[in-house]
Structure formats: C-alpha cells, structure tokens
Swiss-Prot record:
Protein name, as recorded: dCTP deaminase
UniProt keyword Nucleotide-binding present: yes
Gene Ontology molecular functions: dCTP deaminase activity; nucleotide binding
HAMAP family, per the entry: dCTP_deaminase
C-alpha cells in the first residue's frame, strides 16, 4: 500500500467526486481575513472540517454506555459555531465533507496537532474500500478543563492508502451498517 499525494487527492476529488465539498489547497484564513484552523488538501492528506451539530456525553440520565444497546439519552445535542466539551468528556460531530472511497483505497484519520497539543484527541475508525458518507468524528477531551471545538474549521487529517490490488469484498459489498451516513451517527448494533 502506498500513501497518495496531493495530486492524486485533487484528481480523485475533482474527477471522481471522492470528497465533496472539496478544497484543492490549504485554507488558513476566511475571506474576511480571520485565521482558521487549516483545512483542505495537504501534501499527503486532506484536512477535514466538522459541522455545527454535536452530541456531548452526559450522565444526567444515568444511562449506561453499551455499544450493543445504545441509549441516545447519553447525549446532549448542541448546534453552533463552537462546542464546549466538559473536562474528561467526549463529543461526537461529523465532517462537512462527504467521502466516496474507491474500492482499492483504505483511508485513515489522524488528529490535527493544533487540537492534540490542547489535549483533544480525535478518533475515527478507518474508512473502508467503497464506504461513502459523512464521517462521524469522536472527540475526547483528556484535560481537566473545558475544551472548545470550532465548527467549519480543520479538525483531522485523512490519509489515503492505495492497495496494489482491489479487495475481494468491499464495505459496500457486505452492506456495511454505516454506509451513506449523513450527520452525527450513533452506534448501530
């Protein structure tokens, strides 16, 4: 497997709709000149943005977190330009970008250093071959302080690895349960 470059990412996004909406370069400022946490195409990856809808874990309903029987009451919904994650807590968001992963590509997501240096960890499972949708992002605030996530700004980087041969069975072939997700998607059993 080889990591794919900015040229490949641009080609796949512009010619095959792999990423929509798509920024062909790095965006660091708004049109008004305000600094943002960068997003868009980088040398060997694509920095994604998160949307304005967040789900923050809460214990006000005394729910137990069970991935096989998930209770939506475990979350408080927040909509806005920022999300404040309580100390040592967790939130979900989604990418503004919609992805269509090619059959011979596996995509890995890593957090951006700007957030990592603040104790905010981004976790995303791999985007498997032929998966498509908006990515659900998992943010962990590992600090004893509240942490701020900025919507419409860079939060994580996607790395694309192309195999020398296509897989026998893709995510689409097996009817993966998160295919086509749009917005924050909770665990499905």
């Amino acid at each position: 497997m080889t990591i794919k470059s900015d040229r490949w990412i641009r080609h796949m996004a512009q010619e095959h709709g792999m990423i929509e909406p798509f920024e062909p370069g790095q965006v660091r400022d708004t049109p008004e000149g305000q600094r943002v946490i960068s997003y868009g195409t980088s040398s060997y990856g694509y920095d994604v943005r998160c949307g304005k809808d967040f789900k923050i874990f809460t214990d006000i309903n005394s729910a137990v977190v069970d991935p096989k029987n998930f209770d939506a009451a475990s979350f408080v919904d927040v909509h806005g330009d920022v999300c404040i994650i309580p100390p040592n807590s967790f939130a979900l968001a989604y990418t503004l970008e919609y992805f269509r992963i090619p059959r011979n590509v596996l995509t890995i997501c890593l957090g951006k250093s700007t957030y990592a240096r603040c104790g905010i960890i981004v976790n995303v499972t791999p985007l498997e071959p032929e998966w498509e949708g908006r990515v659900t992002l998992e943010f962990s605030n590992t600090t004893p302080l509240p942490a701020k996530i900025h919507a419409n700004e860079g939060v994580a980087q996607m790395l694309f690895f192309e195999s020398d041969e296509p897989c026998e069975v893709s995510y689409a072939d097996r009817g993966g349960k998160y295919m086509g997700q749009d917005g924050v998607t909770l665990p499905r059993s």
